[in-house]
Amino acid sequence: MKRVISVLLVALLGLTTRGSAAVNGDVSGDGNVNVSDVTTEINQILSGSTDGQFDVNGDGKVDVSDVTTVINIILGVYEDPNLKLTGADISLLDRYEEHGALYYDKTGAQVTDMLAFYKQIGLNAMRVRLFVDPANASTTAKGEGVFQDLAYVAKAGKRIKDAGHKFILDFHYSDSWADPGKQTVPKRWSSLTPEVMADSVYAYTKESLQALIAAGATPDYVQVGNEITYGMLWPTGNVYPDGANNKGTWANFSAYFNAGAKAVREVLPAAKVICHIEMANNSNPGKFFGIGAKNFNLDYDIMGLSYYPAYHATASTVITALETVIKQLKVQVPDKPIMIMETGYSYRWEMGGTKDTNISSKYPYTEAGQAQFVADLVTMLNQYECVKGLFWWCAEQNEYGLDWNTNRVLDNWWQASLVDNQNGKILQGCYELANFK
């Protein structure tokens, strides 16, 4: 063991260390994680220490694996297994800032860098969607925010990484919105057979990831598809119900999904693959999807959910509807952590398509009502160790400061932003989000 430890130390001494004020790995107690911590850890191992303070990786032992963990922390490649991600889908942020949207914090001070602000209040991860050829999207879809091509995502992703956030990449595998109601094949793939489609998914995913890495926008987590409760790349990848709709099959869908996952594994072996489904008013989505995913060996690390109370709950089940699904997934896919990849609740007006119009009796459509929803949601989620992520969808949407007639970003307001469109104020719900930990 002494020889193994010596080799590790010699290798590390040849590197430029990167100190940080992180507690995890700072076994020497000097406020940094560097070579002195490796030396301290080695000395503790050689002395036969069983002090839990030096059990850096939390496996109940003090041994050479803890030295490796300290080294990985210094190199920046260690992923804390207990890390929880808190953030938002901010796919519109760069466009809003380019157009001159004005943001203000709760003190009234102008925020000129929203990514730095998010980091300051305690958020640590941001998601951006990627379309194949968004130029092919309809005028309506473009007015809803469909424009994120690879060049845009590369720029946004680099900003996210440079700001110190984890970067979640959301592949839509479509030229426009992909969700439980539509998973339209990109125009460039419209005539492909299932076999060639899978090959195309693999090649496109691999090329996109390589381009992002080259741009300094390396994703930490990758969604292979968006809200794929009923499959992807329809009709051949449609699996509702059980593959009977439009002659889609689980075999096709799993081939498409696993082709994307394979590209992620090859290009970014340290990245986590997220399988993102949506509750779709289904009282037990995991039973349908989880069983199929297991039977067809979908290759993923994390189960992602979308949860919008306006569409998935009633006034009496705003919090419990999601909690019920979390409990079900703990049984159906016990080995998979869960992340809430999308959620949202209005701060002023009822969202179109609201399932229960009495829902505002529980959480009024006000800044305080929205904030209380976030607080109650976070309180519930914090009770479940299996829940490792929480993301607000379109948190950055803000037309304040723009000329609506000539310079707007969206044609319609998203009612559940975490910014008030009328004055640019960042709402209390944004601050509440940071309490998920």
Question: Regions from the language model: what does each represent?
Answer:
Residues 80-117:
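Boundary/entry segment of secreted carbohydrate-active catalytic domains
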Residues 85-90, 126-128, 167-171, 220-224, ...:
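Hydrophobic faces of well-ordered beta-strands that scaffold small-molecule active sites
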Residues 6-16:
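Bacterial N-terminal signal peptides
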Residues 27-50, 59-79:
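Alpha-helical segments with a strong preference for the paired helices of cellulosomal dockerin domains
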Residues 96-97, 101-109, 133-151, 229-232, ...:
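Acidic-and-aromatic substrate-binding clefts and catalytic sites of carbohydrate-active enzymes
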Residues 220, 226, 275-279, 286-320, ...:
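Aromatic- and acid-rich polysaccharide-binding/catalytic face
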Residues 328, 348-437:
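Aromatic-rich peripheral "rim/lid" segments of glycoside hydrolase catalytic domains that contact
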Residues 117-272, 278:
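Substrate-binding cleft and catalytic face of glycoside hydrolase catalytic domains
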